[in-house]
Amino acid sequence: MIYQMQMPEKIDVDEGTHNDKNGIFIAQPLERGYGVTLGNAMRRVLLASLPGTAITGIKIDGVFHEFSAIDGVREDVPDIILNLKKVRFRSSTKRSCKTTVTVDGPADVTAGDIVAQEGEFEVLNTDLHIATVNEGSRLSMDVYIGRGRGYVPAEDNRGDGMPLGFIAIDSIFTPIKNVKFSVENTRVGQRTDYEKMILDVETDGSVSPDDSISLAGKIINEHVSLFANFSPTDEEFTEEEYKQQDDEFENMRKMLLTRIEDLDLSVRSHNCLRLAEIDTLGDLVSRKEDELLTYKNFGKKSLTELKEQLEKFELKFGMDITKYQMKG
């Protein structure tokens, strides 16, 4: 039997400060110590684990490295990158995409000039300054946009198959601008040693404060449920079961070594994979769908064809194959 603990019946909302970007949420009453426990967990998950959309890289015409100056543009490349990191998006898709920005001077380039080609995203801070183009000059650049969680450094955005001149940049995917919490004493009956946890959330507008704390709570719950459902077992594997596991492991390893040219694929898909240096099934399943769609000439038709092939092997994209020690 678990000792009955004092818990909140619901989360209260401070309606006076509540809007699309800001929210103050109050959980009470809590047992002593649980204000900090819950506040810390929610704050960490909100800042680091919620998905969002950000720019992952750029390619500027006539520029081949990130420390260049651009003829006819007041800002140099590092300044432009710093400005692009601040662009905030609301996205309607989970896949990566690319759009082209071309501006002739004299002009002030803003985040509003980054326009989705197929409605994949919406720029929220359209007035954000990106660059200044002088009269008679032009700024033309490809902007690569992706989905992710938290903060991702530039080196992790350098994927295979990117064009010459591609410059990866740090991505701030988190839609949360700021989170803080405080803990105060509160009364239940005659006792005054219970706690009230006040959570103050500010988002960039791509997600509401209500949805953000709901998602953070679900992420925490998914992890904690592993402990709640834990049941130790004394089950032991027989020698035959161990042998079966070894055989399954070896069969999977051999399957992942299957050469791409041995698959029944179209010439277009074969060529796309060859250019991306994807030689085996193992190379293919370790890639994510979003990554494949960034490769040159690789579209949804090729992706559907590859999915059908993987289903025949009972495989899928985004698999972790490190334990199979793939070689050659």
From Swiss-Prot:
GO terms for molecular function: DNA binding; DNA-directed RNA polymerase activity; protein dimerization activity. CDD domains: RNAP_alpha_NTD. Residues 1-231 are annotated as: Alpha N-terminal domain (alpha-NTD). It is an enzyme of class 2 (transferase). Its EC number is 2.7.7.6. GO terms for biological process: DNA-templated transcription. DNA-dependent RNA polymerase catalyzes the transcription of DNA into RNA using the four ribonucleoside triphosphates as substrates. The N-terminal domain is essential for RNAP assembly and basal transcription, whereas the C-terminal domain is involved in interaction with transcriptional regulators and with upstream promoter elements. Homodimer. The RNAP catalytic core consists of 2 alpha, 1 beta, 1 beta' and 1 omega subunit. When a sigma factor is associated with the core the holoenzyme is formed, which can initiate transcription. This is DNA-directed RNA polymerase subunit alpha.
